[in-house]
């Protein structure tokens, strides 16, 4: 999994079969590896489009069932601020088109570092939006049922 490049922000599915992380090669991009046996992982693979783009993707969080990813993406045309949090649903073996979480998670400020609760009902993230205590603060949003 490790290379001469920077790898960070690891995340596992609850069954420990899929390992997601960020690799920085110029811009940040998302990679994954699958578990072969108790001590071996497959070579890492780039998640590719539509998740990774020519822009900057930052940090990734995977739902416990492995069906959703939440991630930071910066400077996208549908963004509300410089960096926003997006999600994508796994359709079979292909990740769907990413969707911006919009307000109340995203704002005109910077949002990043998503971390999804185990039950998938809350997302914790960092933002420098107005109303916090300092430069960057930790925020939480509770998702409504079926949204």
Which role does the model predict for each range below?
Residues 1-147:
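Short, conserved micro-motifs composed of acidic
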């Amino acid at each position: 999994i490790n290379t001469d490049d920077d790898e960070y922000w690891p995340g596992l599915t609850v069954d420990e079969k899929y390992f997601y992380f960020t690799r920085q090669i110029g811009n940040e991009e998302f990679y994954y590896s699958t578990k072969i046996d108790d001590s071996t992982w497959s070579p890492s693979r780039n998640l590719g489009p539509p998740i990774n783009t020519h822009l900057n993707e930052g940090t990734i969080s995977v739902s416990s069932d492995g069906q959703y990813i939440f991630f930071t993406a910066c400077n996208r045309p549908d963004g509300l601020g410089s960096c926003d949090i997006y999600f994508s649903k796994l359709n079979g073996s292909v990740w769907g088109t990413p969707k911006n979480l919009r307000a109340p998670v995203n704002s005109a400020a910077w949002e990043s570092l998503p971390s999804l609760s185990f039950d998938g009902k809350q997302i914790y993230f960092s933002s420098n939006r107005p109303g916090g205590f300092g430069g960057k603060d930790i925020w939480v949003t509770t998702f409504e049922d079926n949204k």
